[in-house]
A protein has these predicted regions:
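A short, well-ordered alpha-helix in the C-terminal region of glycosyltransferases
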Residues: 399-414
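Acidic anion/phosphate-binding donor-loop and adjacent secondary structure
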Residues: 205, 209, 219, 224-243, ...
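Nucleotide-sugar-dependent
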Residues: 262, 317-322, 329-350, 359-370
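Nucleotide-activated donor-binding/catalytic signature segment of Leloir-type glycosyltransferases, i.e.
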Residues: 279, 294-321
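Membrane-proximal helix-turn-helix segments that form the acceptor-binding/catalytic region
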Residues: 135-138, 142-147, 173-196
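Conserved donor-binding/catalytic core segment of Leloir-type glycosyltransferases
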Residues: 243-271, 285
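Carbohydrate-associated surface elements
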Residues: 55, 199, 221-224
Length: 432
């Protein structure tokens, strides 16, 4: 670690870092997540972080955290000693007008509450604004200007590019053009831009913004996993597979949401192809819940699939145990044009931490799976290509899977949030 980073925690005046993250408050209850872990390791390094998020539970039209007439409330995450601030926002469900108004609430009320927060916690020395939506970044830039400090804008989701990529918005529409203009405004006015994809700056070049947003302003800090917590959960919260899960077959595990956007139907189609080929040396176990699960279960039954099982929901703390007992973990979601910029799904890094090979059903630029040889990547996301990959894995000697496993375990170290936070610290010290 850089000497100035090592010394940072020993300064008399601890740097006060405000982490703005609309959805970070659920991390308070989950005791994990990107902003939670960054705050945890900043605190351990001698910094003085607070995390500011919405008090509205994501995608719930009723539930509020610590509902109160007050503009904000603060509760300390005792495990890490970091205050979490819950800013008043209306509840919402879905992705329509109510969610947009919830975002506006968080933006406005964060700006309104800021002076009270500064009086209570002390004026910030730097703002670390983390998006899922851009209004959080705008709030960070405005607060930095108010207090005469620097603002780091962290981009975890490209708005509107991701909406365009999923076909929910036309790229040449007036709304998209306005959002692109706002995005460019954010990148120009931020003091540093953090992107979670290794090809993040390639996106800026593709937009034609490289003349006004220099490469040195943009830093790649990947998503990752808290390995210490991951190992603790694996030990303290073991998962017992049902006795009728085959012991003599390759155990393929998918763990995650089961929604239309995840497009798990393609895995069922791949399983049908394998069944027609009389390939039965594997069992595909699908963990998770979602609104598409009932339809997929019916479809699997209608297709007569013998090698596919829906395992249901497991608590987050048991996911490490589930993954560690697999032979191969399947990373799958709908492929989009954004894949060329690299991968940043939280799930991927949990898969690496399990120390088991990864089967990616799509290809990406800057591929960790390819570069680190910790699994295989399917070049085309089709049922036939996925079936071919599974059949190939079934035919491999155990030594091949063992090598992939060892590489995954080693690779996970570089994505430990303890190490990733060192990169955040380097930015903070650069802006000090």
């Amino acid at each position: 670690m850089d000497q100035r980073i090592m010394e940072a925690g020993h300064r008399e005046n601890h740097m006060k870092v405000w982490i703005l993250d609309h959805y970070a408050t659920e991390m308070y209850f989950d005791k994990g997540g990107r902003s939670y872990w960054i705050a945890k390791f900043l605190k351990q390094a001698g910094y003085d972080p607070i995390v500011v998020g919405s008090n509205a539970k994501h995608n719930s039209d009723r539930q509020l955290f610590f509902d109160s007439p007050d503009l904000w409330q603060a509760h300390t995450a005792e495990e890490i000693g970091v205050p979490f601030v819950f800013v008043k926002s209306r509840p919402y469900v879905g992705n329509g007008k109510a969610r947009v108004l919830n975002m506006v609430d968080f933006y406005r009320n964060t700006l309104k509450a800021a002076d009270e927060l500064a009086a209570h916690f002390g004026k910030p020395d730097v703002i670390f604004a983390s998006s899922v939506h851009p209004l959080t970044l705008v709030a960070g830039i405005k607060l930095a200007k108010r207090y005469g400090i620097k603002c780091i804008c962290e981009v975890r989701d490209l708005w509107p590019e991701s909406i365009v990529a999923y076909g929910l918005l036309k790229g040449d529409s007036l709304v998209a053009k306005a959002l692109y203009a706002g995005e460019k405004w954010i990148y120009r006015r931020a003091d540093k831009v953090v992107m979670t994809w290794p090809g993040g700056y390639d996106y800026i070049v593709d937009r034609g913004w490289e003349k006004v947003i220099p490469r040195e302003k943009v830093v790649h800090i990947s998503n990752g996993v808290d390995l210490e917590e991951y190992q603790r959960n694996m030990a303290l919260h073991p998962y017992a597979y049902p006795e009728d899960v085959a012991q003599d077959k390759l155990r393929l595990v998918y763990a995650g949401s089961i929604r239309k956007v995840n497009d798990l139907g393609i895995l069922l189609e791949a399983a049908k192809i394998l069944q027609d080929r009389n390939v039965d040396g594997y069992e595909l176990l699908i963990f998770g819940e979602g609104d598409d699960k009932p339809a997929l279960e019916r479809r699997a039954e209608e297709m007569g699939l013998r090698s596919v099982r829906f395992m249901g929901f497991v608590p987050k703390v048991q996911v490490p145990s589930v993954l560690a007992q697999s032979d191969i973990n399947i990373l799958h979601n709908s492929s989009t044009s954004l894949d060329k910029y690299g991968q940043s799904q939280n799930k991927f890094f949990e898969y690496l931490a399990s120390g088991k090979p990864v089967l990616m059903t799509y290809s990406v630029g800057h591929s960790v799976v390819k570069e680190e040889k910790c699994g295989i990547e399917v070049s085309r996301q089709t049922p036939e290509a996925i079936a071919d990959a599974i059949e190939w894995l079934c035919d491999q000697p155990r030594e091949v899977l063992t090598e992939y496993s060892e590489n995954a375990r080693r690779c996970a170290q570089q994505f430990d949030f303890k190490n990733l936070t060192d990169k955040v610290i380097a930015l903070l010290e650069e802006l000090r």
